[in-house]
């Protein structure tokens, strides 16, 4: 049986514009991304507290005691995630866990060490509840920027893989650590990690997906920041990487900078043309 060819995703990270009804016209934003040319919508960022409860950005509680509570704050969020994939270009909805903030992945490590990853553990309950409440959710982006605990990250990755999620690491440094994460998770549950979001901006400025970031058959999707590049420049950068090592996807950081001004479609087109 032949291994299926890797799928390339053109992704866009965004925070409040995907859910914050008091600040944004959410139906308009959802429609903009749905028909933008992006194939992956990455909602950022899931915080994990010491009890294991999940929330977006300290302002949108998602789970409490292993139960989905998102409807109390934004009752249309689950339906909006489904709409993203309904009739346009978006094929994958991903939630990103962690950030440069200290704590989220440290809490995951502590919880895995204390409770394991079985059905009775809080993290298992959380991510099972999240998947059930938001069936459109396909993948989890692992944005660990300060914990780097291999055993617990692998256990957590395999756990969410068994719950039906794909895993997409989101590194900006320490390639060898992330190569171990990818190989160990896929060794235990083949196919779980099916892409890598490589940060080539901010702390990862200067990263090159063609140099030092080889994950074997798992494709690397480099990301750039709109503050650094116009759409035409993004296309040129992606085309250079595509010519150098055959990248098949990439992503933009961050939708919050260019909501509703037409740039979403221009950036998606730039990446899509660059990686062909």
Per-region residue spans from a language model:
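Chitinase-like catalytic core of GlcNAc-active glycosidases
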Residues: 2-240, 244-245, 253-274
